[in-house]
Amino acid sequence: MTLSKRLLDLGLALLLLVVGMPLLLGLAGLILLRDGRPVLYLSERMTTPQRGFLLWKFRTMRPDGADRGVSGGDKADRITRTGHFLRRYRLDELPQLWNILRGDISFVGPRPPLRRYVEMFPELYAQVLRQRPGVTGLATLAYHRTEERLLAPCRSADQTEAVYCRRCVPRKARLDLIYARRRSLCYDLRLIAATVIRRIPLN
């Protein structure tokens, strides 16, 4: 990671934390009142093929001790009413500002994968994770809705896993590697702006 990229991460994360603290506290209170504890969902993700970290999110689902893999249609009935709202505008990812400050992730980069997928596709993720993972990125912007459409019909964890591994992992990795070739501070700012614009409610 370049110094300019790290300074952008730190400056923007601190600014958003200060300005957005009332929103963060309000959302935490809303989850606590409507859905109970825990307010946060902590998930192990990988920042390099060898090093994991705990990714912070606001909880959007009812807890399930047997939960594994990515979210597909098989988990749709566990999403809370508050969770639907948070996911629609990606507000569930606001706690990741803490991960950015810690240096676990950047604002822009490939989404940090679960350990299970790094172990299933070691050669692929050895390339993808040469760059620091991020909250948003080219693959997130270009493929997220397609991924949701592909996984929504899945009715079991095994089916979700099969579709994700066969259809989503290689396509997202291809986009992540395109980003790696194009990355620059200006390109990161363009991707951040595109992410914000996409999440603004227009109706």
Predicted regions located by residue number:
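A hydrophobic, helix-centered structural microdomain
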Residues: 1-64, 179-203
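Positions in alpha-helical segments
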Residues: 13, 41, 80-84, 116, ...
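Intrinsically disordered, low-complexity boundary segments flanking structured domains
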Residues: 25-29, 43-44, 122-130, 159-166
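Short, hydrophobic secondary-structure boundary micro-motifs
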Residues: 27, 41, 70, 108-110, ...
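A generic fold-level signal
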Residues: 35-38, 74, 100, 133, ...
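Short, glycine-rich, amphipathic interfacial segments at transmembrane boundaries or analogous
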Residues: 41-78, 139-170
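A short, structured surface patch at a secondary-structure boundary
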Residues: 74-138, 192
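C-terminal terminal-structure detector
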Residues: 130-203
